Amino acid sequence: MSRIGKLPIMIPAGVEITFGEKNISIKGPKATLVTPKCELLSYEHKEDKIILTCNFDTRESLAQYGLRRTLLANCIEGVTKGFSKTLEVIGVGYRVSVKGNIVELSVGYSHPVHIELPDGITAKAEGQKLTIMGSDKVLVGEMAARIRRIRKPEPYKGKGIKYESEIIRRKAGKSGGKGKK
């Protein structure tokens, strides 16, 4: 039995939850998110919390138990506080700028790379840092990964685009002519 699934989800003030036939709609001060309902679980809405219960004792329903609780909790956190990921652009001449909903990266290619942000995602550039913000945790993570993939950090000098908290494993360079006679 999932220990995460057993925990009740607290609903903060200002969040409105609607249970539909196949979806759960969460409306908050920042956005409105929709998450799919699982038929293997039952959802109980009591005052300021939601309690999930497992209807069957199958392997699949137990796997969905903790997952659906976490997805629902992430939606509630997203519509109240929001999520953000910060990327660092490291390298000589590497630059990042945001113009509207387009992120422009100059990261060593012969041309600048333009990435259009989807609806619900905003970006802010401060020097060598790019912060991606939004209410959908999955979409924020996907956009950060897509931007990082343009120029991954290389292990010799550490140049590239990395997450703020990421530690790059560095490699030693060439040994410089040892062993030649």
UniProtKB/Swiss-Prot annotation:
Keywords attached to this entry: Ribonucleoprotein, Ribosomal protein, RNA-binding, rRNA-binding
Record flagged with keyword Amino-acid biosynthesis: no
GO molecular function, one term: structural constituent of ribosome
Gene3D superfamilies hit by this protein: Ribosomal protein L6, alpha-beta domain (3.90.930.12)
Claim: Ribosomal protein is one of the keywords in the record: yes
Segment forming the signal sequence: none
Pfam family, one: Ribosomal_L6
GO biological process annotation, one example: cytoplasmic translation
Transmembrane region(s): none
GO cellular component, one term: cytosolic large ribosomal subunit
Record text on subunit structure and interactions: Part of the 50S ribosomal subunit.
Family: Belongs to the universal ribosomal protein uL6 family.
HAMAP family hit by this protein: Ribosomal_uL6_B (MF_01365_B)
Function (record text): This protein binds to the 23S rRNA, and is important in its secondary structure. It is located near the subunit interface in the base of the L7/L12 stalk, and near the tRNA binding site of the peptidyltransferase center.
Protein name according to UniProt: Large ribosomal subunit protein uL6
Organism: Lawsonia intracellularis (strain PHE/MN1-00)
Gene this chain is encoded by: rplF
